[in-house]
Amino acid sequence: MKQPIHTDPAKPDDFSTEDWRRLLTHLGENADRQGLRETPQRVEKAWKHWTSGYDQDPAEILKVFEDGAEQYNELIVVRGIPVYSHCEHHLAPFFGTATIGYTPNGKIVGLSKLTRLVDCFAKRLQVQERLTIQIADTLMEHVQPLSVGVVIRCRHMCMESRGIRTPGEETVTSALLGEMRTNLGLRNEFLMLAREKD
């Protein structure tokens, strides 16, 4: 699962700061000028952070606990979860928010774990559709709730800054699993709670 950008600097096929310098030179820049001198190191550090999700295990994030709250069997929804990721097609950022809802079946997770789950998958090269499904499938697999719903709203810089150039356009994706697919009332309740705040 783990595919880090940088591993052992002694390996000739490992990506290094020198490769970032070559990119700057390829773009027609002087990599030794003052403003760019430290850029390769900064970019290397930034990409390690932006792709740190490859080093995280979703199963570890979603450890369940028992404190009496697991008796709760109504819909739990967390919305406004920040999403920051990079499109695998152009390496351009996309960002927005996620809403996650689930109906417990004797197991619950801490609310912060849902935010960490989103961050785990967002800090990988992604497409929004897959990101949405990965979050829903992982929650269903490891927590085994009665239902799961995920809605993600994002702006994509690959569309806003190049190509069709549509500033402010938002892409919305959703994944509904378990009773969320068959129970119309439950689905409508989740989708209503997942709507953007006025």
From Swiss-Prot:
GO MF terms listed in the record are: GTP binding; GTP cyclohydrolase I activity; zinc ion binding
Say which enzyme class the record assigns: hydrolase
Which keywords has UniProt assigned to this entry? Hydrolase, Metal-binding, One-carbon metabolism, Zinc
EC number assigned by the record: 3.5.4.16
Looking up Gene3D superfamilies in the UniProt record yields: 1.10.286.10, 3.30.1130.10
This protein's source sits in the domain of life called: Bacteria
Gene Ontology cellular-component terms listed: cytoplasm
Please name the GO terms of the biological process aspect recorded for this protein, alphabetically.
Answer: one-carbon metabolic process; tetrahydrobiopterin biosynthetic process; tetrahydrofolate biosynthetic process
Tell me yes or no: is Transport among this UniProt entry's keywords. Answer: no
Q: Spell out the InterPro entries in the cross-references.
A: GTP-CH-I_C/QueF (IPR043133), GTP-CH-I_N (IPR043134), GTP_CycHdrlase_I (IPR001474), GTP_CycHdrlase_I_CS (IPR018234), GTP_CycHdrlase_I_dom (IPR020602)
Where does this protein act, in terms of pathway?
Cofactor biosynthesis; 7,8-dihydroneopterin triphosphate biosynthesis; 7,8-dihydroneopterin triphosphate from GTP: step 1/1
User: Sorted alphabetically, which SUPFAM superfamilies does this protein's record hold?
Assistant: Tetrahydrobiopterin biosynthesis enzymes-like
Q: Which Pfam family would be a valid example here?
A: GTP_cyclohydroI
Q: Residues that bind Zn(2+), according to the entry?
A: C87, H90, C158
> Which pairs are disulfide-linked?
none
Question: Which catalysed reactions does the entry list for this protein?
Answer: GTP + H2O = 7,8-dihydroneopterin 3'-triphosphate + formate + H(+)
Assembly description: Homomer.
NCBIfam families listed in its UniProt record: folE (TIGR00063), PRK09347.1-2 (NF006825), PRK09347.1-3 (NF006826)
Instruction: Give the family, as the similarity comment puts it.
Output: Belongs to the GTP cyclohydrolase I family.
What this protein is called in its record is GTP cyclohydrolase 1
Q: Which organism is it from?
A: Janthinobacterium sp. (strain Marseille)
The organism that produces this protein has a lineage beginning with: Bacteria, Pseudomonadati, Pseudomonadota, Betaproteobacteria, Burkholderiales
The protein's gene is named: folE
